[in-house]
C-alpha cells in the first residue's frame, strides 16, 4: 500500500513539474519556443521562434488541442497566415499572405469545413480564383492572371469530387480530370478535339 501511495505522489509531482511556461533555446542562445502547460498539457498561448529569434508561429491551445488563433510568419517577419480553431477544427476566418504582405487567400471555415465565399489572389493582386462553399461542398473557379477562366473544380466534404475542367483562353475545354473523394480516377486530354 505504501509503495502504491509513493508512486501516486511521485506521478503527481511529475505532472505538477510540467505546468507553467517551458522555454527551449537554440544552440546560438536564441529562444526556440515558449510553451504553456497546465496539467501536463499545452494550454494557453504557445510561441515558436526562428533561428534569428523572430516570431515563427503562435497558437492557442486547450488540453493539447488548437483552440483559438493560430498565426504563422514568413522569415522576413511579415504575417504568413492567421486561422481560427475551435476544439481542433478550423472554424472562422482564414487569411494567408505572400511574403510581400499582399493577400494570397481569404475564406471561412465552419466546424472544419470550407464555408461561404473564398478568394485567391496572384502576387499582383489580380483574382486567381473564387469559390462558394456550404459546409465543404461547392465549386472553385480559377482564372489566369490575364483574366480568363482556366479551371473549374467541384468539392464535396473539402475534397475534389467530380469533373475538374481546364479551359484555354478561347473557352475550349483542354483537359478533364475525374475525382472521387479527392483522388484522380481518370484523365482526358483535349476532349473537344476528339469529338471533332
Each PLM stretch: what is its role?
Residues 15-196:
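Glycine/tyrosine- and acidic-biased, solvent-exposed loop/turn segments at the edges of beta-strands
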Residues 4-14:
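Sec-dependent N-terminal signal peptides
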Amino acid at each position: 500500500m505504501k509503495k502504491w501511495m509513493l508512486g501516486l505522489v511521485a506521478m503527481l509531482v511529475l505532472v505538477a513539474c510540467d505546468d507553467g511556461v517551458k522555454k527551449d533555446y537554440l544552440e546560438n542562445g536564441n529562444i526556440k519556443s515558449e510553451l504553456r502547460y497546465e496539467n501536463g498539457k499545452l494550454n494557453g498561448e504557445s510561441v515558436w521562434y526562428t533561428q534569428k529569434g523572430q516570431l515563427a508561429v503562435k497558437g492557442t491551445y486547450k488540453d493539447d488541442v488548437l483552440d483559438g488563433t493560430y498565426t504563422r510568419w514568413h522569415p522576413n517577419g511579415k504575417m504568413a497566415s492567421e486561422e481560427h480553431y475551435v476544439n481542433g477544427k478550423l472554424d472562422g476566418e482564414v487569411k494567408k499572405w505572400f511574403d510581400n504582405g499582399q493577400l494570397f487567400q481569404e475564406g471561412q471555415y465552419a466546424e472544419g469545413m470550407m464555408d461561404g465565399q473564398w478568394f485567391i489572389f496572384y502576387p499582383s493582386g489580380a483574382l486567381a480564383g473564387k469559390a462558394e462553399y456550404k459546409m465543404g461542398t461547392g465549386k472553385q473557379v480559377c482564372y489566369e492572371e490575364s483574366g480568363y477562366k482556366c479551371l473549374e473544380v467541384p468539392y464535396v466534404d473539402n475534397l475534389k469530387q467530380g469533373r475538374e475542367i481546364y479551359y484555354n483562353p478561347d473557352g475550349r475545354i483542354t483537359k478533364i480530370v475525374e475525382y472521387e473523394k479527392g483522388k484522380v480516377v481518370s484523365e482526358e486530354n483535349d476532349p473537344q478535339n476528339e469529338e471533332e
